[in-house]
Each structure stands twice: as C-alpha cells, then as structure tokens.
Amino acid sequence: MRKIIHIDMDAFYASVELRERPELKTLPVVISSHHPRAVIAAASYPARVYGLRSAMPMGQARKLCPDLIIIEPNFDKYRAVSHQIHQIFQQHTHIIEPLSLDEAYLDVTENLNNLPSATDVAIQIRQQIWEQTSLTASAGVAPNKFLAKIASDWNKPNGLCVIKPHQVMQFIQNLPLKKIPGVGRVTQDKLQQLKLETLGDLQHIEEAVLIQHFGKYGKQLYLYAQGIDHRSVQAERVRQQISKETTFDQDLYLHECSSYWLMLAEKVWQSLQNKNLQARGVNIKLKNKHFQVFQHSKSFKRALQSLDEFKSVLALLLQEISLTLDDQYRLIGVGLYQLSPSASESQLTLW
C-alpha cells in the first residue's frame, strides 16, 4: 500500500510577504501587480473573508474590498523560500513531485528516516517548515494522490488530515463532487441534473453510463468513486511541455478572458524560468460551453526571448484561430513546448 503526502503551503506568496510586514497580518492583503488588467496571484486569509481569491481580476477585487492592500510579487524571494522547503522534503524522501512553488506530492512509502508512519513524516515536515521559515503548511496523507490532495485542503490553514486505507470508502461517501479535481461549474451542473451530489452517489452508477455522459473523464470519475487513483508520484525530470489552464466558474466571452490569458502566460513563463529552460513553441487551448475544443500552436527557429514576446505570439495565435466573438468559453490554457536547457550554466529546480 502506497503512502502519499500532499503538502500545500498556506497562502504562500502572501505569507512570505507578511513575515516581513507583520503589522498587515490582520488586514486584507493580495499579491498582484498594479497593471490595469492584473489578477490576484495570492490572497491572505483576511482578504478571503471578502471573497477575494487567486486568479480574480483586480477590478473585481477592488469592488469587493475597496481597502485591500496590494503588494507587488517578488518571485525571486518566493523561489528562495521554496528551495528551503524542498530541502526539507529531501531529508525524508527522494520521490518528490512539485506542482508549483508552494505545492508538492511526496511518496513516503519508504521514508529516509525510518519514521513509523506517513503521519509522523507529515508532522515532522510541517514542524521543520515552521521552524525554518516561520510559515505554515497544510498536509494530506492518504494511499493515493487524489485523496492526499483533497485531504490537504480539509483542515486548512495549518492543518493535517490523514485518510488511512480502511477509512477511504467512509471518507469519500459524503464527499461533495465539487471537491474533485477537474469538476468545474459545467460538469457540476451536469452531475446535479443526474441527481448526483457526492462520490457516494457515483458509486451506484455504472462506468459505461458515466463515460456516456462525460467521455474519458467519466472513467476517472468512476475510479475516484471507488477511491482509486493509480497515478504515481513523478520525481522531477526534463519536461516536454510546460502548460497551465483554468476552468471558469461561469462561461466567459472571449474579451472577458484577457486578464486570465495574462495570468496564465506569466505563470507558464515563470515556470520556464524556474526550470532554467528555453522554448521554441507556443500553444493555446480553449473549450467552449458546448465542450468543443480549439487548439493552435506555432514553433520558431529560435527560442522565445521574453515574456512580452510570449504574450505577442499568444495574441497572434488567437487571431489565427478565428474564434467567434459571440461564443462563450469555460476553459482556456497556454503552453510552451520544444524545451531545452537555457544558455545559463546553473540549473535551477522548481523548488
């Protein structure tokens, strides 16, 4: 039986900044640029009380909380702290799959310190993170990645949730389907139309029926309903593509997606820089409200030189794909491919 830990730092970017400005800890703070089309990179917990959240356009955020405090992001600082945290992980296992600067899966089926349980490993990691960085982390411990990720969010912030193998079916019985990765507003609406509210409800539905309604994702839903996730924790390796996508709570017209394009482009470019890689290809992806997928890509003889160039290529791809302005979209994504090491001698890891 595998033992998986999902570590998720609590409001990471905001928490790093608030270490240096403790007088702001009780105030609504967001990490964002002052660009007119900027979106929130992170929101402190007091800011979340107002409904502020990551990826929210700043215009909307200011309406919800006129007195919010904006701090410009400092990714060099966040990478440095991430590296500290990654060093802690490596003291316990070498099987680490970073998802972002503040989130990772760890396979501790066998841990390096011979601690008696995965729970003990998670407790020690969280304690070390606090002692060395003054930041809190939430952790989920479970037999697979799907459950570990859900568990890490269960007692946030600064929480620990453990799902033991014999507790899996009881845990997922009343688990709302909206908690499942990949279940956005549209999928949730379709599930509700079928009178399906929890994973327990899904357990009574045949796999073929779910596939009929949800395509390939129906098979994944069926497995999740049985508490099954065969995915392994993937230790870092050279990636063939770096991409990010987001599913909207409500379908948007194309012109309403502009701030999200900028946010995704910045995240993808930042990930490229973190990996010390360069890219010669750009791709985009959109899914409309009818689940029709549009994709377009373009490659070049030389590597992209800047974030601005990346954004310019994205704008060109959007023009070439000839989308209808009266259509609405539920998902957008951007990516970089044809990756190779950059000219820099030093190879940085994501953490």
UniProtKB/Swiss-Prot annotation:
It is found in: Cytoplasm. Keywords: Cytoplasm, DNA damage, DNA repair, DNA replication, DNA-binding, DNA-directed DNA polymerase, Magnesium, Metal-binding, Mutator protein, Nucleotidyltransferase, Transferase. Coiled coil: none annotated. Transmembrane segments: none annotated. Binds 2 magnesium ions per subunit. It is an enzyme of class 2 (transferase). CDD domains: PolY_Pol_IV_kappa. One of its GO terms (biological process) is SOS response. Mg(2+) binds at residues 8, 102. GO terms for cellular component: cytosol. Its cofactor is Mg(2+). Belongs to the DNA polymerase type-Y family. This is DNA polymerase IV. It comes from Acinetobacter baylyi (strain ATCC 33305 / BD413 / ADP1).
